Amino acid sequence: MGSIGDVMSGEIVVVAPEDTLGEAAERMAEQGVGSSVVLDSGRLIGILTERDLLKAVAGRVHTSEARVREWMTSDPVTASETDSADEAIRTMLDNGFRHLPVVTAGRTVGVVSLRELMRAALQVDV
């Protein structure tokens, strides 16, 4: 199926730990993505996903006040652009993830989604 770099889209939403959940959700909706990476001084410190936002809303959290740092997954598992797509799928399934930040040479270059990986797998198998 190839590498993660062959599969992932170039779209990435970056938020800061002090951004509100509302700000993060707005950016994610504008870009049509299900996750955002949380950077602090250019360093990946977390990931915020649709699931995190749903948990906050279900808990009746005020998204205009709650901060990303309170709801993000800290120190997320990452992959490299050169990792195989099969390896990424296994990591995601084993850990219950749908989004995996992609880091190359210490720089966050994207996020690969399970949907992107499955789409690529189905195109190869057809």
Give residue ranges: language-model regions.
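The conserved cystathionine-beta-synthase
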Residues: 14-32, 39, 79-96, 103-104, ...
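Histidine- and aromatic-rich ligand-binding microenvironments
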Residues: 20, 52-53, 67-71, 84, ...
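A short, polar/charged loop-to-alpha-helix boundary motif
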Residues: 54-67, 114-126
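Short beta-to-alpha loop/turn elements within the nucleotide-binding domains of ABC transporters
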Residues: 2, 19, 48, 66, ...
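A glycine-centered beta-loop-beta connector
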Residues: 28-31, 36-52, 92, 100-115
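Nucleotide phosphate-binding site architecture
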Residues: 5, 13, 22, 54-55, ...
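Bateman (tandem CBS) regulatory domains
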Residues: 2-12, 66-76
